[in-house]
Each structure stands twice: as structure tokens, then as C-alpha cells.
Swiss-Prot record:
ATP binds at residues 266-273. This is DNA repair and recombination protein RAD54. It holds the Pfam family SNF2-rel_dom. Involved in DNA repair and mitotic recombination. It is an enzyme of class 3 (hydrolase). GO terms for cellular component: nucleus. Keywords: ATP-binding, Cell cycle, Cell division, DNA damage, DNA repair, DNA-binding, Helicase, Hydrolase, Mitosis, Nucleotide-binding, Nucleus. It comes from the Eukaryota. Its main location: nucleus. Residues 593-758 form the Helicase C-terminal domain. It is found in: Nucleus. Interacts with MUS81.
Length: 980
């Protein structure tokens, strides 16, 4: 039988265990019952227990005669009648307490299962300890062992450790979502905002998106909307303009009622992600009525960019928003994450999800309030309004839509209409009206055979369309990057086919299948298969050999072609086809030029290069070349997992690692990757869609790039590749419809008419460049030289004679001509006209002689395979280190030229051979050029860059050093500052 002393001991233990406890009751219980239950069950439980036991003890004590009510008295006289009555009261009280506990536990379990649990804080000892009002938490937050508390470095560790504690309530399979696991960032006070304003760097003004005026200014409910200074300090002028533009569109400030979304169509590298994050954070925190305009936002992006978006938001906002990124998650995790995001009381503000994941779970977002702002990255994925992804996103009940795309115009105006209609439904009418009123007249007016009336009508409709869409489409070209990034040169390199490629190409285009295709016409899939086969042949005959061996239908035009291949060339022992010392490289013109270019880069520079192709089989050839020549390389294609891709990018960008080549599939990694560790990029084969090539080419000329950038586009001369590139220029011309860049109201005609598409299966073997022939260039003759007659040449010659020198008249944009030593060799046809756009090849520099190309590496690598080169130099801003190196290089070049002249004078004189060496040394020393101890220090690798006449003059060098000097010698008049 329990005694009062035992009850007292129980009460003391309960008092010493904790100072507070959390009492949970069901929200649907009656209020009076809840208060009574909490009061009797939590606050008064131990007190009533102790009180009754004390009374019984006191009673028994008085019966013994001492009346003290102490514990000893209760023990000695507990056996009498009155003591037995007290014991019964104690047992009854204990049973009542246990019954209350069981009932309260049952109610709490039911509340947990139903999801209507209410958490309250109650004091354990109300007479001694009182609990002030505070936020209810279900457990204590994780406390890191370090004294400095949370930081960016250990926050992820805290999340991982805290995530292990999961409570699954009885009768449920879903874990109980516990809030406030991590301490939230404190709200920014007014004092902090003042400090932020003061912390803005000099010259940077606050960015105010909207401020009340007139009656709104007098209304206290309206407050100004301005961007947090945490982000303002990093925004460039064009990015501030972009944030303001997007805010005006999505906030409804435009007068047009049909506009609630926008398309940010800036070129790659202009910071579309940062601009959208800035607007996202502003709308999550502010609004016209001092309340957030957006409560939930969804960011939809390609799968490969989900983790990149998560890292960018964390980087710029530093944990100020609650976000959830669903990347490579299981189906159960995706469902759980979406449900957590869509809960009415969820603290999550941003959901980052891939296009495929959203399409599969789009039905869950149909409820009202599921999304207040939609951001679609790489929005050219929405170019077809008949896809399931487009339909799923279009059904989302969200009017505020922001589309991010560096290439809004990809193939035709119909695809452009799909993106516009998704952003602002109905703003251009339905598809039938748009096709009849806009698309047909514009396309007809762009044809070379269009009449004057058709051209005028096309110009009018184009101007009308531009006026409408420019209200909610903002596009800036990457010319703005010249103020922030190093100079860039784009080179279109035309490479001849080898004898084997020529024989295979002629056999294919004259085959029965191709003739039947041209005369009768077949399915489009058959045409694309033949085009793909020819493009693979231009890359390397090995790809055709594999096609024939595998009996693939794509090689039907290459029947009986095995006789063209050397015996057992690709069928060596153990399946090896690398015999002959790597002679397989020379079977392709483009591959041969690439192999030489990689060799010169590896030996003479510390540059890194990105090789891009549309075919994984071509990437296999690149990898084989790198293995044979022991070049370190990294490969990223469709088979690379999402988590591994960012690691490969970081590995390539790490300057401490010995990386050289990055093999990239344009389909798998052409979007969003930042490969600033490399400053050279080769597009080995063209794509029908210019957007894919532009996306891939923008991987290296981005924020963070410190070196000069070289972009190479390899094309096989006279083949289908040149025709594909001309088609790209035609599509790029269409993009000006949304930019209003037609000067003097005149439309620029298509570079390729519809009839020209039938000329795909022809081969112009004897010309230097089919593109140059079609341009009908009046700056060059058939040999690529300056036209020798005409009034234009006479006036140009007069101006040339009036100038001081040819070098002074040449505007060397970016300094590429000076560092490559080709300035004195250039004529007017080799020089570009102004700063042309990337599709205006007529104004680029035209080079039939590779020695006039402002690129030292390409000069050395061209060989006999390069037939023609187009160059476009884009100005930029060099970092101070490279600027100093460039100045030192120019000084070195000047001294070297003077030294060569002095050597020539002495060699042509009658000075005896025994005295020439000493005389030459004295003269060079007077000029400041001393081979042994010169005041002009050459770079570490400058030994190979000395002129031919000075090679080997330093007698202290060993024979091995002399051999290596001859091996690494560069045929150039000046060294490239990238060599330093």
C-alpha cells in the first residue's frame, strides 16, 4: 500500500527533473475543458498530490500525540484507522492523475494524426517559476560546439545533424513537421537599415522601385518599395534597369491591362539570375501596402541547374529566405517536399524544381494560392505550346510570370509567339490571328525575291510587333560585357576536307538514295538522317566507318564505302585503331587542325580549352586524342550525373589543378555552366539551332574571366556545315524583330532563301569558303585580296597614303593584332568594319592567308587545311596584371625587331666572321638587348619566342636546351601576352 512518504518523494523527483514542460492539447477540444485539463493535469498535478498526502500525514501525526505532521509521525502511526483513510485518499488521487494522463495522451495522439495540434507553454511550478510569452517550439534547436554560433560554413552541418531527429506520430506514416529547427535570422530593424544605407559604397545610389505619389503619399498604408542594400551594392547599371523593368511588368504598373509578366532576354553572361533573385527577394519582403506582394514563388529550371539556383540564392541572400530545391530526389521525397511547400502554414517561400518534375506533379499546384510568382529559367524550353510541360505550366494559377532566356527567338516567329502567349496570354491574339497578321507578311518580306510592296508590308508589321512586345521584353546584347570582361575574338575557321573525306562526301551526294530524295522528296526524318550523316563525316571518317559496321539506317547513303578506307585502319589487334603513331587524326581536316592547336596551346601557354560537340562519338575521338598525347581532360555529357557536374566544373576552374581540356556535350551542358577556368572554346560542329551554339559559346566569356577569350567555330569548307551556319545567320536576323534594330526602317533580308535549302546536298570543293562567296564581298577578290579597281579603292588608297602608316590606320580592337604580330601584314580586307554583330559576317575581318589572323596559336596551327578565316574582335577590359604583361610584351617586341635589323646589317657587311660575334654583342648591348644579362627580362618561356636569327646565340645553353628551343619555336613577330 503506498505511503505518504512515497508520494512526497515522487513529488520531489518531479520538481527536480525539469523547470518547464510543453503541454499539448487538441485544438478542437472545448476551451474550458482544455484550461481545466491543463490546470489540473500540469499546474496542479504535483501540488494536489503533495497536499493530500500532507493532510493524511498530519492527521496520523496528531493521532500519535506530537501534532507535528512530520514524516516520521506519519510512518509510525500509519496503521490506525485514520491513517488507513488517508492512504485510501492517496491511492484514489494517484488513480485520478493516471487517468488524466492517459486521456490527455490519447487526445494528443489524435491531434497529431489529424494535424491540428496546438502547442502551449505552461509552468511546471506556477508558484515559483513563471513563463513569459514566447514562440512555441517543439524541441530545442541544435547548438553547434563552436563559440561563434552559426555561420555559412556550419549551417549545412547543422541542417544535416538536426534532420536526423524525426518524430512519426502514432497511427501516421508521415513525419511530424517540426518548425524552428534552426534559429531564424532576426528581422532587420530600422537601425540596421540605416547602417546598410551608410554602408553603400560611394557613388552607388539606393534603388527605389516605387514610391507613393499624390494621394497615395498621404495614405499611411502605402510605403516605398526599394531593393535591399545587400543586393544593390552588386548590381551593375544594366542590372538595375532590368530589375526596375521586371517590377513594372509583374506589379501591374504598366497601363496595359493584359501585361502581368515579362521576358528578360539578355544575352548570356549579363546576370539574368542575379536580377531575378533581386526582384524575388524584394517581392517576398515588400509590397504597395507594406505587406509582401509574393508569399510563395516557384522557380522552374532545367534539371542540371536546380542545384546552381539553390547555391545562387544562398550566395546572394545568405539564408534570408526559406527555400526547397528538389534535385535528384526520390518520388517520396518529391511528394513530401511539394506537400510541405503547399501547406497553408508552411514557412517555405521558394521552391526550385525541374521542368520534368513540375510536369509530373503539376496537378498539386492547381489549388489557389499555390504560387504568387513563377520564374522559368532557360525559357526557350517553352517554345512549343503543344508540349505537356508547356500546358502544365500554363495551367498554373499565377499571373506574375518571368521568363529568362538568352535566345527567345530560336527557329521561327511561331515559337516566339508561344513564349509571348505563355507570358501574357492573349496579348497578341490567338495563334491563327498571329500567323495571318504578323508571321506571314514578315517572313514574305524577308525573302530575297520579295517585291517592294511585300517588303514594305513586312516592315510595317515588324515595327508594329516590336512596339507591342517591347513593352514586356527586355533584351541587351553582350556588348555591355566589354566594360567588365576581357577582350574576345570570334574566329570562323573553314577547314578543307581530306582526300578520304572528299571521296566519301562525293560518293554520298551522288548515291541513288540522295538523288531520289532530291527528286521525289521523302519524309523529313529521312532528310535529317542524311544531314546528320554528312555532318559526322565532316567531323571524322571514323564515325562513318562505325555507322557502316553497325548497319545503321543512317548510313544507307554510304553503301559499298568500305573500299575507301585503308585496310584494317580501324580494326587493329584487340579492337585498337590507334596504330600508325596516331595517324588517324590526319584523316579529318578539322581534327588535324585541332590536334596541332592543342599541341601549341599545351607547349606554349597555360591556357585551358573547352571542346564542344553535338555528338558523343566526336567526344570519344577527343578523349582518344587526349589519352594518346597525355593531355589531362574532363568530360561532361548526358551520362554525367547532376551532382557530379558541378564538381567537374569546379575541378576545371580550380587554378591549382593541372587541367587542360574540358569535353562538353552541347545538349547536356550548354546551358548555365560557368567555365571561366578556360579562355578558349571550340565549337567543332554547327547546330541547326543557333541558340544551342550561342549558349555553348558563352560558357567562358562570363563574370570571373581574367584572360583574353578566343572562340573558334570550325566549319568544313564547301560542305553542309557552311550551309547550316548560313541558316543560323538567317535565324539570327529574325531575332531583330523583337529588338527594333532595323536602321532607316529597312529590313535586312534573309541570308538563305527557301529555295537554297534544296542545295543542301551539294559540294563546292574548289572554293575557299562558300559563305564568303555568297556574301558577294566587294572588299576581296576570289583570292581574298583587296579589290584592285573601282572608285572605292581609289578613295581608300588616297586615305591610306594620307595616313602616317598602315599600322596607325588599323584600329586594333582588344589588342589582338599587336600581340600576334600581324598588324603590318594586314590590308583593308583583313580588318573588320567597326564593331559588327556576330551574324554580320560581311563586316568581319576576311583572311585567306592565316598569317594575317590576329591569333598567334591559329597562325601556327592552320597548316594547309585552313582555307579561310572570318574574325570579329570585341573590345574588353583587361585586368591590371595582363595589361602590364601586354605593355612588357610590346617593349620586348620593339627591342626584338631592332635587334633583327642589327643582325641583318652585320650579316650583310664585310666584317670578318670572327669579329661579327663581338660586334653584334656590343651593338645589342647598346640597344638594351643582351642575351646573357639583359635589362629587358624575357618571360620564362620567352626562349622559344626569340627571332630565328637569335636562336642558339647564347653559347652557355646546352645542346638539349637548344633542341627544345627549336621544338618550341613560334613563327611570330611578337609574343602573345597570354604566354607570360
Amino acid at each position: 500500500m503506498p505511503s505518504t512518504s512515497k508520494c512526497n518523494r515522487i513529488s520531489r523527483v518531479a520538481d527536480e527533473e525539469e523547470e518547464e514542460e510543453i503541454v499539448a492539447v487538441s485544438s478542437d477540444a472545448d476551451e474550458s475543458e482544455s484550461e481545466s485539463e491543463v490546470g489540473s493535469g500540469a499546474e496542479e498535478e504535483d501540488d494536489d498530490y503533495v497536499g493530500e498526502s500532507s493532510d493524511s500525514a498530519g492527521g496520523s501525526g496528531s493521532g500519535s500525540g506530537d501534532g507535528d505532521g512530520d514524516e516520521e509521525g506519519g510512518r509510525s502511526d500509519i496503521g490506525d484507522g485514520e491513517g488507513e483513510g488517508g492512504g485510501r485518499r492517496v491511492r484514489s488521487a494517484c488513480r485520478g492523475v493516471r487517468a488524466n494522463d492517459r486521456e490527455r495522451k490519447s487526445q494528443n495522439v489524435d491531434a497529431l494524426v489529424r494535424g491540428n495540434l496546438v502547442v502551449r507553454r505552461q509552468p511546471l511550478i506556477p508558484r515559483i517559476l513563471s513563463v513569459s510569452d514566447a514562440a512555441a517550439i517543439a524541441r530545442k534547436p541544435f547548438k553547434p560546439p563552436c563559440q561563434n554560433g552559426y555561420s555559412e560554413n556550419n549551417e549545412q552541418l547543422a541542417r544535416r545533424l538536426s534532420a536526423r531527429k524525426r518524430f512519426v506520430p502514432w497511427g501516421s506514416v508521415q513525419p511530424f513537421a517540426v518548425t524552428n529547427i534552426l534559429p531564424q535570422s532576426p528581422a532587420v530593424s530600422s537601425d540596421d537599415s540605416v547602417e546598410n544605407e551608410e554602408s553603400l559604397p560611394p557613388g552607388i545610389e539606393p534603388l527605389i522601385l516605387w514610391q507613393p505619389e499624390g494621394r497615395d503619399k498621404e495614405n499611411s498604408n502605402f510605403s516605398a518599395i526599394k531593393v535591399d542594400h545587400l543586393l544593390v551594392r552588386y548590381l551593375r547599371p544594366h542590372q538595375r534597369e532590368g530589375v526596375q523593368f521586371m517590377f513594372d511588368c509583374v506589379s501591374g504598373l504598366l497601363n496595359d491591362d493584359g501585361i502581368s509578366g515579362c521576358i528578360l532576354a539578355d544575352d548570356m553572361g549579363l546576370g539574368k539570375t542575379l536580377q531575378s533573385i533581386t526582384l524575388l527577394y524584394t517581392l517576398l519582403c515588400q509590397g504597395f501596402d507594406a505587406k509582401p506582394m509574393v508569399k510563395r514563388a516557384v522557380v522552374v529550371t532545367p534539371t542540371s541547374l536546380v542545384s546552381n539556383w539553390e547555391s545562387e540564392i544562398i550566395k546572394w541572400l545568405k539564408g534570408r529566405v526559406q527555400l526547397l530545391a528538389l534535385c535528384e530526389s526520390t518520388r517520396a521525397d518529391v511528394l513530401s517536399g511539394i506537400e510541405s511547400f503547399l501547406k497553408p502554414l508552411s514557412r517555405l517561400q521558394v521552391l526550385i524544381v525541374s521542368y520534368e518534375t513540375f510536369r509530373m506533379h503539376s496537378s498539386k499546384f492547381e489549388r489557389p494560392g499555390s504560387c504568387d510568382l513563377l520564374i522559368c529559367d532557360e525559357a526557350h524550353r517553352l517554345k512549343n505550346d503543344q508540349t505537356l510541360t508547356n500546358k502544365a505550366l500554363a495551367a498554373l494559377p499565377c499571373k506574375r510570370r518571368i521568363l529568362l532566356s538568352g535566345t527567345p527567338m530560336q527557329n521561327d516567329l511561331e515559337e516566339f509567339f508561344s513564349m509571348v502567349n505563355f507570358t501574357n496570354p492573349g496579348v497578341l491574339g490567338d495563334a491563327t490571328y498571329f500567323r495571318r497578321y504578323y508571321e506571314a507578311p514578315i517572313i514574305c518580306g524577308r525573302e530575297p525575291t520579295a517585291s517592294a510592296e511585300e517588303k514594305n508590308l513586312g516592315s510595317e508589321r515588324s515595327a508594329e510587333l516590336s512596339a507591342k512586345v517591347n513593352l514586356f521584353i527586355l533584351r541587351r546584347t553582350n556588348a555591355l560585357l566589354s566594360n567588365h570582361l576581357p577582350p574576345k575574338i570570334v574566329e570562323v575557321v573553314c577547314c578543307k576536307l581530306t582526300a578520304l573525306q572528299t571521296a566519301l562526301y562525293n560518293h554520298f551526294i551522288h548515291s541513288k538514295n540522295v538523288k531520289r530524295l532530291i527528286s521525289e522528296g521523302t519524309k523529313q526524318s529521312k532528310v535529317l538522317a542524311y544531314i546528320t550523316a554528312l555532318k559526322k563525316l565532316c567531323n571524322h571518317p571514323k564515325l562513318i566507318y562505325d555507322t557502316i559496321k553497325s548497319n545503321n539506317s543512317g548510313g544507307s547513303g554510304f553503301d559499298d564505302c568500305l573500299r575507301f578506307f585503308p585496310p584494317e585502319l580501324f580494326s587493329g589487334r584487340s579492337g585498337s585503331w590507334t596504330g600508325g603513331g596516331g595517324m588517324w587524326v590526319e584523316l579529318s581536316g578539322k581534327m588535324h587542325v585541332l590536334a596541332r592547336l592543342l599541341g601549341h596551346l599545351r607547349l606554349k601557354t597555360d591556357d585551358r580549352i573547352v571542346l564542344v560537340s553535338n555528338y558523343t562519338q566526336t567526344l570519344d575521338l577527343f578523349a582518344q586524342l587526349c589519352r594518346e598525347r597525355r593531355y589531362p581532360y574532363i568530360r561532361l555529357d548526358g551520362a554525367t550525373s547532376i551532382n557530379k557536374r558541378q564538381k567537374l566544373v569546379n575541378q576545371f576552374n580550380d587554378p591549382s589543378r593541372d587541367e587542360f581540356v574540358f569535353l562538353l556535350s552541347s545538349k547536356a551542358g550548354g546551358c548555365g555552366l560557368n567555365l571561366v577556368g578556360g579562355n578558349r572554346l571550340i565549337l567543332f560542329d554547327p547546330d541547326w539551332n543557333p541558340a544551342n551554339d550561342k549558349q555553348a559559346a558563352a560558357r567562358v566569356w562570363r563574370d570571373g574571366q581574367k584572360k583574353r577569350v578566343y572562340i573558334y567555330r570550325f566549319l568544313s569548307t564547301g560542305t553542309i556545315e557552311e550551309k547550316v551556319y548560313q541558316r543560323q545567320m538567317s535565324k539570327e536576323g529574325l531575332q531583330k524583330v523583337i529588338q527594333q534594330e532595323q536602321a532607316d526602317g529597312k529590313m535586312q533580308g534573309s541570308s538563305l532563301s527557301t529555295e537554297d535549302l534544296r542545295d543542301l546536298f551539294t559540294f563546292h570543293e574548289q572554293i575557299r569558303s562558300e559563305i564568303h562567296e555568297n556574301l558577294k564581298c566587294n572588299r576581296c577578290n576570289k583570292d581574298g585580296c583587296m579589290v584592285l579597281d573601282g572608285s572605292k579603292f581609289d578613295s581608300a588608297a588616297t586615305e591610306h597614303e594620307a595616313s602616317n602608316s598602315g599600322e596607325n590606320s588599323y584600329i586594333d580592337i582588344g589588342g589582338f593584332g599587336a600581340i600576334s604580330g600581324c598588324v603590318q601584314k594586314m590590308n583593308s580586307s583583313n580588318q573588320q568594319i567597326g564593331s559588327p554583330s556576330e551574324e554580320d559576317l560581311g563586316s568581319w575581318g576576311h583572311h585567306s592567308d592565316p598569317s594575317t589572323v590576329p591569333d598567334t596559336i591559329l597562325q601556327c596551327s592552320s597548316g594547309d587545311e585552313v582555307s579561310f578565316v572570318f574574325t570579329n574582335q570585341i573590345d574588353g577590359k583587361l585586368v591590371p596584371v595582363e595589361s602590364m604583361a601586354r605593355a612588357a610584351t610590346h617593349r620586348t617586341h620593339e627591342v626584338t625587331v631592332n635587334a633583327e635589323k642589327e643582325v641583318g646589317k652585320i650579316n650583310s657587311s664585310n666584317v670578318p666572321g670572327t669579329e661579327r660575334q663581338s660586334l653584334l654583342g656590343k651593338n645589342l648591348k647598346m640597344m638594351g638587348f643582351n642575351l646573357k644579362n639583359s635589362s629587358m627580362k624575357f618571360p620564362t618561356k620567352s626562349r622559344r619566342m626569340l627571332p630565328n636569327c637569335l636562336q642558339g646565340m647564347n653559347k652557355t645553353s646546352t645542346s638539349s636546351d637548344h633542341q627544345q628551343t627549336k621544338k618550341l619555336h613560334v613563327i611570330s613577330d611578337a609574343s602573345d601576352d597570354d604566354f607570360v
